[in-house]
Curated annotation (Swiss-Prot):
Protein name: S-methyl-5'-thioadenosine phosphorylase
Any one Gene Ontology molecular-function term assigned to this protein's record: S-methyl-5-thioadenosine phosphorylase activity
UniProt catalytic activity: S-methyl-5'-thioadenosine + phosphate = 5-(methylsulfanyl)-alpha-D-ribose 1-phosphate + adenine
One Pfam family matching this protein: PNP_UDP_1
Domain of life, per lineage: Bacteria
């Protein structure tokens, strides 16, 4: 199988340096328009697609990001390995601003977003016990360390709806739950990537201590913006290190991410809604054709 790397860039990461034959491409999906056109090209010989999650100019809030269209569009382009890069707050003293956390678990507290490609007319249940790809996450950690940034492998990401930051009570609650970082965008993104059978890794770039820390007070947007710049530089270095680690060819995912739908479809073929099936052509075409 040919490798194609996808990158969804969050706050502060709006482009990828060094892409050859780079072109912004409009991708149409049955779920509406993605956040923006998608920058495609090659990096060190490996095909790559970059999508700014909030759109160029930061036009989408965490709630209005078209998550389904974004994942569908990347799947249509042939993305096999998808890396999410996003800003986050930290609940742990040791996970300091400027550090990267390679997320391996989520608690989803978002509530105003469509969270599945499936539904009435074609029901499917995929496993999210391990919502990120262990293989891809390990390679991201390796590439991040090569940039000199401090990397923490493993951590639980609390996804809040936003766009406001947490209250002090919320921040203390989430910390007491054992969460490591907090952000607004990785859900339902990770869920949809699993439904689309795309290997997904989440690189959470710490910008602040949320509002729980007694010596840092409430979230300071000015300080966040300053940290975003440094984090973005390291993120670009991480992405630059991925082609050499992933290569141009890939085997089946050892964790089964690319076969997540093998036993997931529940609706009998004769009862499936043709209109929904038509919308699932990219996401679930492998199993629907079978």
């Amino acid at each position: 199988m040919k490798t194609m790397i996808g990158v969804i860039g969050g706050s502060g990461v709006y482009e990828i340096d060094g892409l050859e034959d780079a072109v912004w491409t409009k991708v149409e999906t049955p779920w509406g328009d993605p956040s923006d056109e998608i920058l495609t090209g090659r990096l060190d010989g490996v095909p790559m697609a970059f999508l700014p999650r909030h759109g160029r100019g930061h036009v989408h809030s965490p709630t209005t990001v078209p998550y389904r269209a974004n994942i569908d569009a990347l799947k249509r382009l042939g993305v096999t390995d998808l890396v999410s890069v996003s800003a986050c707050g930290s609940f742990r003293e040791e996970m300091a601003p400027g550090d990267f956390v390679i997320v391996d678990q989520f608690i989803d507290r978002s509530f105003a977003r469509a969270k599945s490609f499936f539904g009435s007319g074609c029901v499917a249940h995929v496993s999210l016990a391990h919502p990120t790809c262990g293989r891809l996450s390990a390679l991201c950690a390796e590439a991040a360390r090569a940039t000199g940034v401090t990397v923490h492998e493993g951590g639980t990401y609390l996804c809040m709806e936003g766009p406001q930051f947490s209250t002090l009570a919320e921040s203390l609650l989430y910390k007491s739950w054992g969460c490591h970082v907090i952000g607004m965008t990785n859900m339902p993104e990770a869920k949809l990537a699993r439904e689309a059978e795309i290997c997904y890794a989440s690189v959470a770039m710490v910008t602040d201590y949320d509002s729980w820390h007694p010596h840092h007070g409430e979230v300071d947007i000015t300080a966040i913006i300053a940290t975003l710049g440094t984090n973005a530089d390291h993120a670009r270095g991480l992405v630059a290190g991925l082609p050499a680690r992933l290569g141009t060819e890939r085997d089946l995912c050892p964790h089964g991410c690319d076969r997540a739908l093998d036993h997931a479809l529940m609706t009998a073929p004769a009862k499936r809604d043709p209109e929904l099936l038509a919308k699932l052509d990219a996401v679930a075409g492998r199993v629907l054709k079978g």
